[in-house]
Amino acid sequence: MTSTIPIRWRVVLVAWLLAGTLAFAQPSGEPLASAVDAVNMTVSDLDRAVNFYTRVLYFEKISDTEVAGESFEHLEGVFGLRMRVARLRLGDEYIELTEYLAPKGLPISRELRSNDRSFQHIAIIVSDMDKAYAWLRQNKVEYASSGPQRLPDWNKNAAGIRAFYFKDPDGHPLEVLAFPPDKGSQKWHRSSEELFLGIDHTAIVVADTDSSLKFYRDLLGMRVAGESENYGTEQEHLNNVFGAHLRITSLRSPSGPGVELLEYLAPRDGQPFPADERANDVLHRQTEIVTADARTAAQKLVSAHTKFVSSGLVTESDGQLGFRNALLVRDPDGHPVLIEEK
């Protein structure tokens, strides 16, 4: 049942952030990013999206909330908004699905390719790839790969991984992935009767890995957990991009799923992130990162000349939406990142 929550927020303008003092400083050496909380995807019809994720992919709906008000407008950069947000869980990980009741945004372009810089997916770990693929086919999902691919043995960092790209009803890319015994977190190898186990990471296409590392590693404090260079017919058919040659960098924070950077060394013809993308467009996906002190994070983001979507730091006085302070920014390629203090 949908509930409407009264909103009591205030907006702290970015200019104010520059006046922050050492009283808000985090302990020395503590990363800004303490966890990746969720990936939030804008959808055109929340009921349809929730049905897909719960019925086909076995997510559990945790909450369904309707919100509106000036402070949300400042946070998301959309005037006159009213949003309905559902939070879903799979294993230990979460996603959020947001339908903008007003104003409606643009749909995802059918021409979106896996090497376009607006590409982002979540990687869902499965216990049995053959069973997962058969189930997805039975449910007539839209293909993004030509079929499941097994990455070749010559690629030591990825050998034996099986993966398949497909799309949800709105066109959001998704991946199912199965690790061989020598790869992936131990949690993915525990005995389980479940077919869909949880979310290992979200992957984003970037123009330049080193520039992205300055944001995710050097600014937010995420650590590099793995690197790989993938190419060949298996990678081409997984991404459905002829000649695909990728530099892949996996990043982790202390908890939650990882963030994976996908740089296409070839081909280099991927489209840039749309400069006019807005949070109510169905293309919108925001990675939600938890920080211990959003004010300190905001100050550092301003100092690093990060592009803000929010007009400033938004504070929720009663904490009913799960965080006290939050702001929405863009990474070097334009991918939205929500920084939130619980």
Range-by-range predicted roles:
Residues 1-8:
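N-terminal secretory signal peptides that target proteins for export/translocation
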Residues 10-23:
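Bacterial N-terminal signal peptides
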Residues 24-31, 34-45, 84-97, 102, 108-197, 204, ...:
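Vicinal oxygen chelate
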Residues 42-93, 131, 138, 154-158, ...:
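Core segments of cupin and vicinal oxygen chelate
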Residues 47, 51-67, 101-103, 110-118, ...:
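Extended intrinsically disordered, low-complexity coil regions enriched in Ser, Thr, Gly, Ala
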Residues 105-106, 172, 270, 335:
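Short, charged/polar, Gly/Pro-enriched secondary-structure boundary elements
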